[in-house]
Amino acid sequence: MPIRARIIGIDPGLRFTGFGIIEADGNRLRHVADGVIATDGAAAVAERLHTLDAALARLLATYAPDHAAVEETYVNRNATATLKLGYARGVALLAPARAGIAVAEYGAKTVKRAVVGTGAAEKDQVALMVRRLLPGAAITRADAADALAVAICHAHHLATASRVPAA
């Protein structure tokens, strides 16, 4: 059975969180919205997380997605930066779950493989393929392109799961 779903993809970050909303109808994908949620870098971490949570709640209420997909956190050498990214990711996971929306998680290589065909793709290759898969989308920020890629990855996984018979 072909899938029909509205999906929000989220690329979490404490300073900038990208979001992308698509509709999947069978093999066709349609761009709905995308953008970036920015927090004040001078504000306390708790205030920034509150800003992120409130913005995600508004997006979820406005666009009413059926599914959410969040990119997994990569660990870098700066432990403090990794922890802060983890805080933002926690909010990105909690907001849709609190709204009763199923949340999937995908690593960067899985997203790249689903969108470009290789897990070693560069960011500009991912953005180019997102634009090809979503014609007419005027994507202006890399974070938004990444979030749309996460949503596309989830759409592909939903489509595959719908074709595989249950055991």
UniProtKB/Swiss-Prot annotation:
> What UniProt keywords apply to this chain's record, in alphabetical order?
Cytoplasm, DNA damage, DNA recombination, DNA repair, DNA-binding, Endonuclease, Hydrolase, Magnesium, Metal-binding, Nuclease
Q: Which SUPFAM superfamilies match?
A: Ribonuclease H-like
Q: Where, by residue number, is the active site?
A: D11, E71, D143
What does the record's cofactor remark say about binding?
Answer: Binds 2 Mg(2+) ion per subunit.
The record's Gene Ontology cellular component field reads: cytoplasm; Holliday junction resolvase complex
* InterPro entries (alphabetical): RNaseH-like_sf, RNaseH_sf, X-over_junc_endoDNase_Mg_BS, X-over_junc_endoDNase_RuvC
Q: How does it assemble?
A: Homodimer which binds Holliday junction (HJ) DNA. The HJ becomes 2-fold symmetrical on binding to RuvC with unstacked arms; it has a different conformation from HJ DNA in complex with RuvA. In the full resolvosome a probable DNA-RuvA(4)-RuvB(12)-RuvC(2) complex forms which resolves the HJ.
Q: Report the protein name in the record.
A: Crossover junction endodeoxyribonuclease RuvC
What lineage does UniProt assign to this protein's organism? Bacteria, Pseudomonadati, Pseudomonadota, Alphaproteobacteria, Acetobacterales
**Gene encoding the protein:** ruvC
